[in-house]
């Protein structure tokens, strides 16, 4: 039976930038801080009804079903002489993996009947012996979390002597994503005897407590502190996973911490990098971090998430953006909604004004710490709060099935000192809108545009993904409501 421990230490000051271009997740004027800032197939017969595989968060965390759209996974093997199309490098069922019975029972309990497309290609490569590194890219909601968790569980040695010695380490950019991953491990490992899981994130427990767990999931700075204080024994580690790897390798501070953590681990460790996006300039760092890797990738055009209707609204000014947002409140609460803003100050101000006007909203940013952050995200997961205002701290990985709408109150943009104009952050846009429109459901992503620069950034995003973002005229509010309700009401009723 899986159990959980939690561990905490203070964060570590961020290091220097890893690349000339650094994207700041909260857009604050001050430099970013450490990780505390960052936040179905058919049944086996082929004839029965769809049995959803829950992805991202476990079912009790209200995770969404799997997004398994038609796309091609491109495979590049570390052994260049091997044929990536060889049947040895693909599976059609979990039974082909020869999983231990307790793990197979966990998959059945989670309604995992058949592997998703990314799992079909990733799992045989991940679980092969001797272990090989992997860099894997796939859309949000396609089973990435389940793939690396399955590999980890299959590699553990849970004898009484080793079950409390860390054998796998998962690094995530935020405490929210770390907690979500722990939920997936515990669900999949329900029947695995002797499994202990520890959460190593800031502000949790006694900072001098030793880590006694088979699997550790944490944020880079906290894990680095634990290792340096000799509270985390790395001797038996077999697998290192970076979830949302492009974000962590790119971000100032987080990237440095990931590199330092890896330098403190056994040289024979299997390194696995997963993300929905891997910009070309980050791929160079990824290959240095995980050398001689098998690589799974998608084209830009295949990354946009199916089932999401993308719209934009012309607003006359920043104040007009707020007025439109308030008008949107009735639509926001049909399901659950996330409003993404650029700065903590914007999040706090919008929350203050909307609450003062009698609306029920909550905000979550990197400035909120520890237990308070957990309480806010839990309220959003269980539906007590239906509208969440946040910065990019929640743009990645967080999976809540009831989210029917995402609002880009501020268009995500790159931090490019000296640039001639503001530049869109297409990768973050994709991660943001991926919080809605999960498998089998329809979602809406609405971007607010209030000036020429923001309009141009949206055009850049459309061009990058070869997609269309439809303009909605805010002068005819009845038409706006009609369009949005037509999209999200059937999905909300289906829930």
UniProtKB/Swiss-Prot annotation:
Keywords: ATP-binding, Cytoplasm, Helicase, Hydrolase, Membrane, mRNA transport, Nuclear pore complex, Nucleotide-binding, Nucleus, Protein transport, RNA-binding, Translocation, Transport. It is found in: Cytoplasm; Nucleus, Nuclear pore complex; Nucleus membrane. This is ATP-dependent RNA helicase DBP5. GO terms for biological process: mRNA transport; protein transport. Residues 125-296 form the Helicase ATP-binding domain. Transmembrane segments: none annotated. ATP binds at residues 138-145. ATP-dependent RNA helicase associated with the nuclear pore complex and essential for mRNA export from the nucleus. May participate in a terminal step of mRNA export through the removal of proteins that accompany mRNA through the nucleopore complex. May also be involved in early transcription. The gene is DBP5. One of its GO terms (cellular component) is cytoplasm. Associates with the nuclear pore complex. It catalyses: ATP + H2O = ADP + phosphate + H(+). Residues 1-10 have a biased composition (Polar residues).
């Amino acid at each position: 039976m899986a159990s959980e421990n939690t561990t905490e230490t203070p964060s570590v000051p961020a290091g220097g930038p890893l690349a000339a271009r650094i994207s700041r997740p909260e857009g604050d004027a001050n430099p970013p801080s450490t990780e505390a800032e960052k936040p179905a197939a058919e049944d086996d017969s082929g004839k029965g009804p769809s049995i959803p595989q829950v992805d991202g968060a476990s079912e009790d965390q209200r995770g969404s079903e799997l997004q398994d759209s038609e796309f091609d996974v491109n495979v590049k093997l570390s052994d260049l002489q091997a044929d990536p199309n060889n049947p040895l490098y693909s599976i059609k069922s979990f039974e082909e993996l020869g999983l231990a019975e307790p793990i197979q029972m966990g998959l059945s309990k989670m309604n995992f009947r058949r592997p998703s497309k990314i799992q079909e290609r990733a799992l045989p490569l991940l679980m092969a012996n001797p272990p090989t590194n992997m860099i894997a890219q796939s859309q949000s909601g396609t089973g990435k979390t389940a793939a690396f968790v399955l590999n980890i569980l299959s590699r553990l040695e849970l004898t009484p002597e080793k079950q409390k010695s860390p054998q796998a380490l998962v690094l995530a950019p935020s405490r929210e994503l770390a907690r979500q991953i722990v939920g997936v491990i515990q669900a999949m490992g329900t029947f695995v005897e002797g499994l202990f899981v520890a959460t190593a994130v800031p502000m949790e427990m006694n900072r001098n407590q030793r880590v006694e767990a088979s699997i550790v999931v944490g944020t880079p700075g906290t894990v680095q502190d634990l290792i340096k204080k000799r509270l985390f024994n790395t001797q038996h580690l077999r697998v290192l996973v970076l979830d949302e790897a492009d974000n962590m390798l790119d971000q100032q501070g987080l990237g440095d911490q990931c590199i330092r953590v890896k330098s403190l681990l056994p040289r024979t460790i299997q390194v696995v990098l997963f993300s929905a996006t891997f910009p070309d300039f980050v791929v160079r760092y990824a290959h240095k971090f995980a050398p001689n890797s098998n690589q799974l990738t998608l084209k830009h055009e295949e990354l946009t998430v199916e089932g999401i209707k993308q719209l934009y609204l012309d607003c006359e000014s920043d104040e007009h953006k707020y007025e439109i947002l308030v008008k949107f409140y009735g639509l926001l609460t049909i399901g659950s909604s996330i409003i993404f803003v650029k700065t903590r100050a914007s999040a706090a101000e919008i929350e203050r004004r909307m609450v003062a006007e009698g609306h029920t909203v909550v905000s979550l940013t990197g400035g909120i710490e520890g237990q308070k952050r957990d309480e806010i995200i839990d309220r959003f997961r269980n539906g007590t709060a239906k509208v969440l205002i946040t910065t990019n701290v929640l743009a990645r990985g967080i999976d809540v099935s009831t989210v029917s709408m995402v609002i880009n109150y501020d268009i995500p943009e790159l931090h490019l000192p000296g640039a001639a104009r503001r530049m869109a952050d297409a990768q973050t846009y994709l991660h943001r809108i991926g919080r809605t429109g999960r498998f089998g459901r329809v979602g809406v992503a609405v971007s607010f545009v209030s000036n020429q620069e923001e309009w141009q950034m949206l055009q850049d995003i459309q061009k990058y993904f070869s997609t269309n973002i439809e303009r909605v005229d805010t002068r005819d509010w009845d038409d706006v409501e009609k369009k949005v309700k037509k999209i999200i009401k059937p999905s909300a009723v289906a829930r």
